[in-house]
Amino acid sequence: MAAPPAIPRRGLFIGGGWREPTLGRHIPVINPATEDTIGDIPAATAEDVELAVAAGGPVLARRREPWARASGATRAKYLNAIAAKITGKIAYLALLETVDSGKPKDEAVADMDDVAACFEYYAALAEALDGKQHAPISLPMEEFKTYVLKEPIGVVGLITPWNYPLLMATWKVAPALAAGCTAVLKPSELASLTCLELGAICEEIGLPSGVLNIITGLGPDAGAPIASHPHVDKIAFTGSTATGKTIMTAAAQMVKPVSLELGGKSPLVTFDDVADIDKAVEWPMLGCFFNGGQVCSATSRLLLHEKIAEPFLDRLVEWAKNIKISDPLEEGCRLGSVISKGQYEQIKKFISTARSEGATILHGGDRPKHLGKGFFIEPTINTGVSTSMQIWREEVFGPVICVKVFKTESEAVELANDTHYGLAGGVISDDLERCERIAKVIHSGIVWKNCSQPTLVQAPWGGNKRSGFGRELGEWGLENYLSVKQVTRYCKDELYGWYQRPSKL
């Protein structure tokens, strides 16, 4: 088993340096796999947010100062330097992420690879942005010439979740900096360690002071002041739908743009024409048990054609029994702990309610017997689920899947869309025409065909309905942080001629 890393004690990263929180408060860091306190993080408050926003403002000075005016190529050099540093620290950062969040070490390593790749991707887009400025617009008249400028929005507030701490932060930080914005990042208080290490990396590579500021703390104390701050020009948030509504309300008071990536209750529709059941079974496993099911896009509603339901569930249970559940630092661990005691108790309550409402727990539902401490939950499979049950309608955010059987394609589509959410969905079928039909009628921002959960930095990510709006990743992620300006000039030597010219005296 890998040795736990030393936990650095960091302050708030503001204006290119470290400072203690104004009120001197700290929040303990709990390793969810052992329940041990392993360190602490600063507890920022509104006073610290004020300092962080002020640090970002002068650097940007409302789009006139060096970071915003720097070429995309210049900003790309910094982003590539961050990527290189992350690549050199992958093993350490992965261990830090593991003890902070409870996710298996192998998953954390993959996350860090993706973090570096994301910075590299947006470095390339930053460089390409130079060539897209002054793009002419074809007009039907000759007397005007028009082009478009893409400018940084300004100071952006980035509020990120605990399930992929550094990766979800990078999805926002990398495009924001590529666009020329300055940023105040507020990661979840449940998993902030790697985000603070990002501050140390920015210091190492000489990122101009104030371009990225990182504050840690509780949502009401540190997140809310960012959302309501008059000098924060945009908010990008990933987290719960309830908090998303609060952020929208705060931003609306200043007509401030927001982008929201919120909850989900995604369906995975599986038809009876699959020739290889094990190949099909692997996708709901990845779709709901990877990262402990703590994934906003988790395909936690499994819809099975009645002809395949029994053999499919038999194999799903066998696969679930075969998952290695252990301390996430152990080699080969495939299911670690959930993030916290509160999350553990909430998931257990979901399972208990499902049982009391009439669902059958086909497998799991409890703490693994061989683990006496830590916030571990077995992969849990619920059958006999009705559409009125809480387990069908609400996001669990844990390794809990609910199963419903269908007879026809139209019934499957109706069940798939029976949700307030619209982040993702999937279809498993050997009939590719059927897959295409289903992809077109599932009401979500992402649809997977014969897979679940591939997340590609080049492709848009985001949802519909109560899963939020706006898109991250790909070129769409960069556009999130750019303001479009039309510039038009009159080209003729003569008067435009709308008004009658007065006679000369």
From Swiss-Prot:
Q: Coiled-coil regions in this chain?
A: none
> Which cysteines share a disulfide bond?
none
- Family designation: Belongs to the aldehyde dehydrogenase family.
GO term, biological process aspect, one: glycine betaine biosynthetic process from choline
Specify the enzyme's EC class, one word. oxidoreductase
Protein name, as recorded: Betaine aldehyde dehydrogenase
CDD domains (UniProt xref): ALDH_F10_BADH
Coarsely, its chief localization is other
- Describe, as the record does, how this protein assembles with itself and its partners: Homodimer.
Supply the alphabetized keyword list. NAD, Oxidoreductase, Peroxisome
Source organism of the structure: Hordeum vulgare
- Motif Microbody targeting signal mapped to chain: 503-505
Looking up Gene3D superfamilies in the UniProt record yields: Aldehyde Dehydrogenase, Chain A, domain 1, Aldehyde Dehydrogenase, Chain A, domain 2
